[in-house]
Amino acid sequence: MKTYFIIIHLLVCNILIASLFPLSVHSSTPEIKIGSKKFTESVIMGEIVTDLIKSTGEQPVYLRELGGTRVLWNALVKGEIDIYPEYTGTISEEILAGEGVHSEEEIRQALTRHGIEMTKALGFNNTYAIGMKKQVAEELNIQKISDLCHYPNLKFGFGNEFMDRGDGWPALRKSYNLPQENVRGLDHDLAYRGLEKGTIQAIDIYSTDAKIKYYDLRILEDDLNHFPLYNAVILYRSDLEERVPHVVTVLKKLESIIHESEMIKMNSRANLEMVPENQIASDFLLENLSLETEFYEETAFGRL
């Protein structure tokens, strides 16, 4: 009889626990983790993806500004994150360098071998470019990258990643036979300051960078077509198609809807008007997908 009451007591306790903590019973799906790189555009796209996935009822974790390309890629392959925004040029020239992939289909097949899938292009090409102050370029009559060959004493300031990547400075120099020796690797913000002060004359920039207009820069024509297309895409783990197929479906809603002018506008709001990236993402989804999202006011503690 005593044993009977103990069993009844345990059953009642289990029912109470299940009613108080229903999530612990039903949350068998591992949480979805989204990453982004340490620059504004990647952070904004990560916010857009996060809000979009939340609209499915999932509660993804957004790990913003994790690091550079290798950090994000390795985390994706290892399963430490499930999704992050990337560019086709970075995939072919850096991540899969040496595998001889160039077309979108070749990239897609190579990624699948790593257990990774890729959406179609989101709608804008954020290629690398070389920029100069417009006034300096006009004074020297520099219109295209090959014109730099006539000015060996010009000083260049390139981002550290550009100094090392497959289509970066070493390859650019070889493609155009550029004679410049005074080339420094530095942070992008310092490069812009160098342009303003006149201590450097050319920098690498992204073609959707909001600071192009702000600093009145001239984008030099890539007349030898050195830089590949950097079409924005979303990379995600192949196992998401079985784990959470509705998440993969909603990711594809971003295909072909973020145009270059729209991305420049979003970058400008973040970098020049200091609008929080999550507010920008929320506005974009409302305007383009009629999706209302919960905007939270970011604080210093919110970034920790």
Indicate residue ranges for each PLM-predicted region.
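Alpha-to-beta junction loops
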Residues: V77-E86, P152-K155, A171, L190, ...
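Extracytoplasmic
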Residues: T29, G67, K78, R113, ...
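A bilobed periplasmic-binding-protein/Venus flytrap-type ligand-binding module shared by bacterial periplasmic
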Residues: T127-E138, N231-V244
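Beta->alpha turn/N-cap motifs
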Residues: E65-T69, G79-S92, S103, K133, ...
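Bilobed "Venus flytrap"/periplasmic-binding protein-like clamshell domains
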Residues: E31-V61, G123-R193, V275, Q279
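N-terminal hydrophobic or amphipathic helices and topogenic motifs
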Residues: K2-F5, H9-V61, E65-G67, M263-L304
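Ligand-binding "clamshell"
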Residues: I95-T119, T199, K211-N225
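Soluble extramembrane regions of membrane proteins in the secretory/endomembrane system
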Residues: Y176, Y206-T208, Y236-R237, T249, ...
